[in-house]
């Protein structure tokens, strides 16, 4: 879609890598389109980064020992609590990413612990990305919400690819 607009509206031409330096009116398409198969083949940490960035989040700098948080989403309009406070205050949502076909209840249980542990009073909303989720995982998210009022949004990779995840945010 973007390539079509660049060609039709901006009258730019698609170029091969390395050729743009010679023609400033050209563009290079890179990393698109992703497919389920390509994403399954990515190294684990690259997949995590792809998913977090696709949600509009910030990936962790540290990949090992991340305490169950692969990235964070900072809500728009977040302001520091006080002068000299942290840039985004303490208002953020954790993202957990699993590069597996179906996340089960044990993974959701672990993420619930993360949401309860992080920050004063815990996190009110979190996002969990995977290729799929078991019905037990879905039921546990509903039960967790009923018990605590906290919300875990389950987002499949296909929903990200189809850009349907925006409605879940």
Positions of PLM-derived features:
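Mixed-charge (Asp/Glu-Lys/Arg
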Residues: 1-169
């Amino acid at each position: 879609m973007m390539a079509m607009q660049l060609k039709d509206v901006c009258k730019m031409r698609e170029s091969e890598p390395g050729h743009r330096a010679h023609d400033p009116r050209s563009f290079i398409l890179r990393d698109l389109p992703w497919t389920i198969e390509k994403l399954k083949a990515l190294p684990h940490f690259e997949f995590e980064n792809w998913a977090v960035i696709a949600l509009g989040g910030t990936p962790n700098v540290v990949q090992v020992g991340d305490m169950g948080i692969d990235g964070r989403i900072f809500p728009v309009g977040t302001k520091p609590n006080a002068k000299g406070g942290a840039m985004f205050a303490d208002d953020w949502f954790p993202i957990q990413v699993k590069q597996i076909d179906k996340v089960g209840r044990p993974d959701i249980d672990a993420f619930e612990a993360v949401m309860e542990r992080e920050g004063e009073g815990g996190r009110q909303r979190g996002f969990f990305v995977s290729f799929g989720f078991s019905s037990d995982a879905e039921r546990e998210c509903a039960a967790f919400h009923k018990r605590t009022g906290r919300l875990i949004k389950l987002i499949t990779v296909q929903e990200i690819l189809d850009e349907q995840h925006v409605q879940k945010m």
